[in-house]
């Protein structure tokens, strides 16, 4: 039955003590059928106590009536608990008052049930028992040799074969903090060359285990030292401010190809160069190729900066080339305006970049070659 699951069957015994023989027999049959217990019936409480005194260890459950003429049920419960402390007693009574229930529990009974007992009460009776105690009794019987022979044979066959041959099992030593402390103490006294077992004073430990642990200890020390040195080096790098001065930032500016076709109307940009570190002639050539102009305010100290502008081409202004005779470098300021004729401007740029007509002599005026546009008419 589903309600009887978990009940230890087979080897458990019970006693029923009731002066009403008819009720005692019916209770015995129901316990045997529902719980599968071995039941013994007594109509005399004195005889039941004599049986418990001789075989108290073999009885696991007792059902006793409270209203008995030969001996009161409370007195029977008290004596039975003195004979066998772990015995479990369930009291039966026709009157289940609060006083009766409290008295039974105080004397050590599990529960008080109402007479007469029916099948439902018997089925739920095992729920009030201490199943752990009953299972422990069954385990004790099994250890004494009571049990299924086939089960014992299977358990014997499950052992490893090396135990049948009589070989010893291999044990592993666990280095607890206490053993580690003794190991380090011996290491400080004798050094890494040798560690005496007498100093450690530990049983069940040999030299092989100590040497193996010593190798592991050395590896751990190497790891700690390498980690400490790496951490120290990284801290020095971060704390040294001079290391930051070696960091340089270089920026590369991409400019369009000088021969690519630019739109007719372009935005003019001011192209400033460092006169002290760059050649002015190269700067002029690069400015003409890029279609940009130099800022004249950078060369305000030039004595030739006030020269008149020369008219070239179609009448557009071309700033005269100014030469700084006082310094080692000369300055050239060129202003190019983009006319409607883009091809004409490109032709001027090509002639200037490839021409060698512009000759500059240091300490004197530069010879300026002017570009003149000749008309196709013969009159000019």
Swiss-Prot record:
Instruction: Summarize the PTM comment.
Output: Two-component system major event consists of a His-to-Asp phosphorelay between a sensor histidine kinase (HK) and a response regulator (RR). In plants, the His-to-Asp phosphorelay involves an additional intermediate named Histidine-containing phosphotransfer protein (HPt). This multistep phosphorelay consists of a His-Asp-His-Asp sequential transfer of a phosphate group between first a His and an Asp of the HK protein, followed by the transfer to a conserved His of the HPt protein and finally the transfer to an Asp in the receiver domain of the RR protein.
User: Where found, per UniProt?
Assistant: Nucleus
> Where is this chain compositionally biased, Polar residues type?
228-245
DNA-binding segment(s): 169-223
Where does this protein chiefly localize? Answer: nucleus
For the modification 4-aspartylphosphate, the affected residues are 65
Per UniProt, residues of the Response regulatory domain are 13-130
| GO BP annotations listed | cytokinin-activated signaling pathway; phosphorelay signal transduction system
- Superkingdom to which the source organism belongs: Eukaryota
- What keywords does the record list, in alphabetical order? Activator, Cytokinin signaling pathway, DNA-binding, Nucleus, Phosphoprotein, Transcription, Transcription regulation, Two-component regulatory system
| Ranges where the record places region Disordered | 225-245
Matching Pfam families: Response_reg
Q: Which GO terms describe its molecular function?
A: DNA binding
This protein's GO cellular component annotations are: nucleus
Any idea what job this protein has? Transcriptional activator that binds specific DNA sequence. Functions as a response regulator involved in His-to-Asp phosphorelay signal transduction system. Phosphorylation of the Asp residue in the receiver domain activates the ability of the protein to promote the transcription of target genes. May directly activate some type-A response regulators in response to cytokinins.
Belongs to which family? Answer: Belongs to the ARR family. Type-B subfamily.
Q: Any idea what this protein is called?
A: Two-component response regulator ORR28
